[in-house]
Amino acid sequence: MDARTIALDDSHGDVLVVAVRGEHDIYTAPMLRDRLEQALGTAPTGVIVDLSAATFLDSSILGALLEARRQALEQTVGYVVCLGEEPERGVERILEITGLVPVFPVVRSLDEALEAARSAPADA
């Protein structure tokens, strides 16, 4: 069984969750882009990228996250990254060393992410 998945969860009403699980790189970046475009294409109130089960992200994944953030800003859709309560240190670190923590609203729980996606303006 391949533990690398990217799933779209629409069970939270007006906020869609793109759940990223496992190691992701240039080979799975197109799938992430597709899921993010699919989520943004429905004109939700917000999109959450759930990285709580991600174990590795390369630069192509970071590029996909940045592009989706840009699209969310253009569409005034809330965009939040959820690292989870105990994120994989490598995932958290890559966001820190690339300077992306201030670019994305980053939270630790799905509840926090849902609240932030619904209440924060997209350009925050």
Spell out what each predicted region is.
Residues 35, 111-112, 122:
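Alpha-helix termini
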Residues 26-103:
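Amphipathic alpha-helical interaction surfaces in cytosolic regulatory modules
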Residues 23, 85, 110-112:
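Short, solvent-exposed coil/turn elements at secondary-structure transition points
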